[in-house]
Amino acid sequence: LSVSVVRDCENVFYSKSVDKSRDIVDCISIINGSESLYENVEAQSNYNSQYLLLCKNCIDSYYLVDCVNCTNCFLSSNLRNKEFWIRNKQSTRDEYFKEINKLNLKSRVARNILLKEFKEIKKNAIYRFANLTRCVDTTGNYLLNVKNGKNCFEVYNVENSKYCYRGFDY
């Protein structure tokens, strides 16, 4: 069962507020062409990733908070345009894949341990006041391409709106 899944979605399971995405499981607020995600929250245009929070354009990554344009990153926060990072430290391609294989991400026990570490990363990450992207004269949070909006939340591609939740051009 998924709630509020609209606009060109395929294979969305146990998720809420998903648009223009496919192969999504256990996610909330996923938009703009995301694909093959598990346990993502407030994600845009991510691919083949798990446990991402507030991330955009990330590929093949796990356990990230507020990361943008990252590829093959793991257990990190507040990264921009990075590749092969583990626990907020740069690594080589070989080191990265060696560490990932050593962690055995398919094991439920290993995942529970990583989730505890991820909880600490979320607690210590730096968060923006509001997530506004290409917005003008707008108040609210989780907004994309909004002009003249007042108290809008999870809204994108709209103009002259007030007191909206989950609004977008259709």
Regions found by a protein language model. Name each.
Residues L1-Y170:
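Long, distal/terminal scaffolding or interaction modules
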